[in-house]
Amino acid sequence: MNSRNVCSLVVSINLVVFAVGGPPSVSAWQKIEARVTRVIQDVQLVGTNAAARIAAVNDSVSEGTKVRTGADSRVELTFSDKTVTRLGANAVFDFRDGTRNLNLEDGALLLRVPKSANGARISAGAIAVAVTGTTVVLEYHATYYKFLVLDGTARLYRPGHLGDSILVKAGQMAFGQPKAALSDPVDFDIGRFLKTSRFITDFSPLGSESLMASESHKQQREKSKKNLIDTNLVIFGGGTVVSLVDPAQVTAIDQEKAGPSAIPGSVPPATTALNSGEKAK
């Protein structure tokens, strides 16, 4: 059995949900198209053997077309099955076979897959995520990744490594190095993420707000029972470095809410950890 480095932190980040079931037919995926539904600053579409062009709302995005975002830029793509993908700053993304093969080459994305859709799979280097009927966030770079679930459940795994797979539930986050064995997920504060993430504050409602709010309320109830405890452990912006901060600074983060972030992009300006009460000493 592989040992896992278990942390009982709760960080305000969101992840995508996975539902178990057989894959839909190839024909079902091939009918799915994507369209640009929101553009913030510098976003380019790069087709196969074609020059880059500036993306505009209502542009059609075909499979194999790379979507690139610049510094402090974001974009939203909506597929014909109502699946929504939002990319943060400095991201590179493309897809094939509809939502069956979403490829995040670099950067961060939010993915919302409605229960009526066939589901989706995100590939990012040496890791992958299977999602059905949920809302998730994945940040990927060559040296680290960070995955959060906002509602539902998703599966994070490493293709080609039998058994290296974990279920990540709403309010949980997993992070690590892409080529290392997966670690057990930790808790994060959904409510704080929803208040501070540009994936949420810079866009129109996703359609899964009631589901995310329900999961946040569950966390609040667990806090009132002391099963979850707020900590002063914070991840600022992108990355996976956990910082120990003064409690007053955590309060200031809440007050800033969706204010300008020191690190442009779609991850929250800061994520605050929660501790599982039953594990607290």
Residue ranges and their predicted role:
Residues V92-R96, G133-V137, P178:
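Extended lipid/amphipathic-ligand handling interfaces
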Residues N2-K31, A51-V57, G88, A142-Y145, ...:
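C-terminal interaction modules
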Residues V26-L45:
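Short N-terminal segments immediately surrounding and downstream of signal-peptide cleavage
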Residues I40-V43, D72-V75, T134-T135, A154:
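Generic short beta-strand segments
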Residues V67-V129, F147-L156:
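Short, small-residue-rich packing micro-motifs
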Residues G47-G64, R68-S73, A89, G133:
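N-terminal post-signal-peptidase region of extra-cytosolic proteins
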